[in-house]
Curated annotation (Swiss-Prot):
Family: Belongs to the PanB family.
Protein name, entry field: 3-methyl-2-oxobutanoate hydroxymethyltransferase
Pfam families xref list: Pantoate_transf (PF02548)
GO terms, biological process: pantothenate biosynthetic process
Key words, A-Z: Cytoplasm, Magnesium, Metal-binding, Pantothenate biosynthesis, Transferase
Subunit structure: Homodecamer; pentamer of dimers.
Pathway terms, separated by semicolons: Cofactor biosynthesis; (R)-pantothenate biosynthesis; (R)-pantoate from 3-methyl-2-oxobutanoate: step 1/2
Entry GO MF terms: 3-methyl-2-oxobutanoate hydroxymethyltransferase activity; magnesium ion binding
Catalytic class of the enzyme: transferase
Primary role: Catalyzes the reversible reaction in which hydroxymethyl group from 5,10-methylenetetrahydrofolate is transferred onto alpha-ketoisovalerate to form ketopantoate.
Cellular compartment(s): Cytoplasm
Cellular component terms per the entry's GO annotation: cytoplasm
Active site positions: 183
Natural source organism: Leptospira borgpetersenii serovar Hardjo-bovis (strain L550)
Length: 265
């Protein structure tokens, strides 16, 4: 585990960018543990990327706890943030405390992330901080509210919408959130929010002026050939690499070339 103040210190704003990667499993977490990446997010996006659902809504707290435990085993020295899934904190302050407490106790994660910037959410953030649970906020396109937004659309485009997002970002910061994810908002708004709030902003489709960036590991590795949102840069093409390797294995099994002498006892 790493010190939160070394990675998400407000003093680093505008100086050193923060790199965050979303991961769900032991094997990839172990690789991330060998890299200089600053932090790992165990996101409820696993509902779509790992489980094949059309949204994050079906993901349960038990599933998030399971995956966060697995990632911690693979990356014991990384700063790990775990998403609290849909309806694990929205029903009451008490439920939010229980869910966040379970996540911290049972997974050994370093912080939790919750979506939204309402008065209720800000109150929950403040209370969680008081009892010793660091909270990362999340504004813009908040996937747990996808039905309210009418799909995965860019948020904060109008004057009223952008002003509301800025107010919520300031409120989250003042309530004690140590960092805020900004998802799918105009780059200019991402810059403005980053300048206005006193904590690091982590962007995903929020422009280059955020204090850091986050991408899903599967996405940046190019595991899904059909997934290409505008904000995504693929740093590899693992879809083709994996497909070619499996086809080679299949051909060698069919031909009898594998297993050969080197792979037999």
């Amino acid at each position: 585990m790493k010190n939160i103040h070394k990675i998400f210190s407000p003093e680093k704003k505008g100086k050193e960018k923060i790199s965050v990667v979303t991961c769900y499993d032991f094997s990839f977490a172990r690789i991330l543990g060998e890299t200089p990446i600053d932090s790992i997010l165990v996101g409820d996006s696993l509902g779509m990327v790992f489980q094949g659902n059309s949204s994050t809504l079906p993901v349960t707290l038990e599933e998030m706890i399971y995956h966060t435990k697995v990632v911690r085993r693979g990356a014991p020295d990384k700063f790990i943030i775990a998403d609290l899934p849909f309806l694990s904190y929205q029903t009451s302050i008490e439920e939010g405390i229980r869910s966040a407490g379970r996540m911290m106790k049972e997974t050994d994660c370093d912080a939790v992330k919750i979506e939204g910037g309402s008065d209720f959410i800000c109150e929950l953030v403040a209370i969680l901080k008081q009892i010793g649970i660091p909270v990362m906020g999340h504004l813009g396109l908040t996937p747990q509210s996808v039905h309210v937004f009418g799909g995965h659309r860019v948020q904060g485009k109008g004057e009223e919408s952008s002003a509301k997002l800025l107010r919520e970002a300031v409120a989250l910061s003042e309530s004690g959130a140590f960092s805020i994810v900004l998802e799918m908002i105009p780059a200019e708004l991402g810059k403005r929010v980053s300048e206005e709030v006193g904590v690091p902003t982590i962007g995903i489709g929020a422009g280059p002026d955020c204090d850091g960036q986050v991408l899903v590991l599967n996405d940046l590795l190019g595991l899904d050939a059909n997934f290409q949102p505008k904000f995504l840069k693929k740093f590899s093409n693992l879809h083709s690499i994996v497909k070619d390797a499996i086809e080679s294995y299949h051909e060698e099994v069919r031909s009898g070339e594998f297993p050969g002498k080197d792979h037999s006892f």
